[in-house]
Amino acid sequence: MPKLNKVTPFEQHDKRPKGIYILPNLFTTASLFAAFYAIVQSTVGNFGNAAIAVIVAAVLDMLDGRVARMTNTASDFGKEYDSLVDLVAFGLAPALILFEWGLQSLGKAGWLIAFAYVATTALRLARFNTQDSPSKRYFQGLPCPAAAVLLAAAVWTAESYGVTGTSFTVAGLVLMALLAFAMVSAMPYRSFK
């Protein structure tokens, strides 16, 4: 005799409005918009605006997870979507900003270090997504939003003081390489979740 699926009585179904599941993903989408804006601004030479957009993306990234936990709407879809957006916002956008601003003059070496930063961001995210953390209080490796904010803050600060990207080339190269290494290192970093 075939086994029948158990039917859940209507009164036991989740009564939350379906729209509440959209709320955390709206923050994630806003983070993606900020990353896209950062990329566009960097391609037209507005590096200060691009840097600020990456910082805005980081703030929105902090909020999407908190909103999902507060509203009890965390989902596998949301986790995957957040990770894809993180790669764009904290890997591609800051790498392109720094490349356009100061690494372009290095030719192949410039785009190789920028690509290495994007690749280590992807590796950091993949490790975070697949590895059970022994401690909720610490991350293994520098979180990619922190690395991106440090790069963006360096560009924004330099731009504010009139420092051009070409005079920041070596410092930018070293900073990007150090942050790329820190993301994939085994060093513990405190979590503020």
Which ranges hold each PLM region?
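Helix-coil boundary and interhelical linker segments in multi-pass alpha-helical membrane proteins
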Residues: 37-52, 88, 92-112, 154-171
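C-terminal membrane-associated helical module and adjoining short loops/tails
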Residues: 1-12, 136-193
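Multi-pass membrane catalytic core of lipid/isoprenoid biosynthesis enzymes
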Residues: 19-29, 70-128
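C-terminal ends of transmembrane helices
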Residues: 64-75, 122-136, 141, 181-192
